[in-house]
Amino acid sequence: MKAIILAGGHSVRFGKTKAFAEVNGETFYSRVIKTLESTNMFNEIIISTNAQLATQFKYPNVVIDDENHNDKGPLAGIYTIMKQHPEEELFFVVSVDTPMITGKAVSTLYQFLVSHLIENHLDVAAFKEDGRFIPTIAFYSPNALGAITKALHSDNYSFKNVYHELSTDYLDVRDVDAPSYWYKNINYQHDLDALIQKL
């Protein structure tokens, strides 16, 4: 099982590259890597990013998005790594701007996936908040690759397009025993300021 850290965004709203922003002196991407490593669930943790940022990560396992799908958002990162690892049975996806994700959240979602896998033939297990799904904290089966490829070849790179074609189930973020901010995206500087005040 592989983990994909999505870190190829342009971070326009934040004002600088979010992957290298810090919480308590630790970069977002380093925090996420450390959390994923702590679960002992993954045989490989891969950072998915663009050519401009790739050399800035102090981490050996960085993959640049497929050149045919530059600037097509997070789906391009998932597509690129799935294509490179056709033998893999499962991929966990997390965005780099979710620095407070916990190992407990990852393992809880995995247990949810396993318990529903046979009965529902799930392709995707994701979290949801107030009925809104969070596609960038989710497990994806390789079966999702076809729908992702189709979306990338269309003019609509949204996860909704992909999810409509797949067997998907959701776990509520409140079902995780963790601080309420564990799944929050940091989109703006004031989001980070608010988070730091809570810590």
Swiss-Prot record:
Q: Which UniProt keywords apply?
A: Cytoplasm, GTP-binding, Magnesium, Metal-binding, Molybdenum cofactor biosynthesis, Nucleotide-binding, Transferase
Q: From what superkingdom does this record's organism come?
A: Bacteria
> Which gene carries the instructions for this protein?
mobA
Q: Which family does it belong to?
A: Belongs to the MobA family.
Q: What broad class of enzyme is this? A: transferase
Q: Which Gene3D superfamilies match?
A: Spore Coat Polysaccharide Biosynthesis Protein SpsA, Chain A
Where, in this chain's numbering, is GTP bound? L6, A7, G8, K18, D65, D97
Q: Which cofactor does it need?
A: Mg(2+)
Single Gene Ontology MF annotation: metal ion binding
GO CC: one term? cytoplasm
- Which is a GO BP term held by this UniProt record? Mo-molybdopterin cofactor biosynthetic process
One Pfam family name is NTP_transf_3
The main place the protein resides is: cytoplasm
Q: Which residues bind Mg(2+)?
A: D97
Report the domain remarks: The N-terminal domain determines nucleotide recognition and specific binding, while the C-terminal domain determines the specific binding to the target protein.
What name does UniProt use for this protein? Probable molybdenum cofactor guanylyltransferase
EC annotation from Swiss-Prot or TrEMBL: 2.7.7.77
What organism does the record attribute this protein to?
A: Staphylococcus aureus (strain bovine RF122 / ET3-1)
Give the function comment from the record: Transfers a GMP moiety from GTP to Mo-molybdopterin (Mo-MPT) cofactor (Moco or molybdenum cofactor) to form Mo-molybdopterin guanine dinucleotide (Mo-MGD) cofactor.
Entry's localization field:
Cytoplasm
Q: Which InterPro entries match?
A: MobA-like_NTP_Trfase, Molybde_CF_guanTrfase, Nucleotide-diphossugar_trans
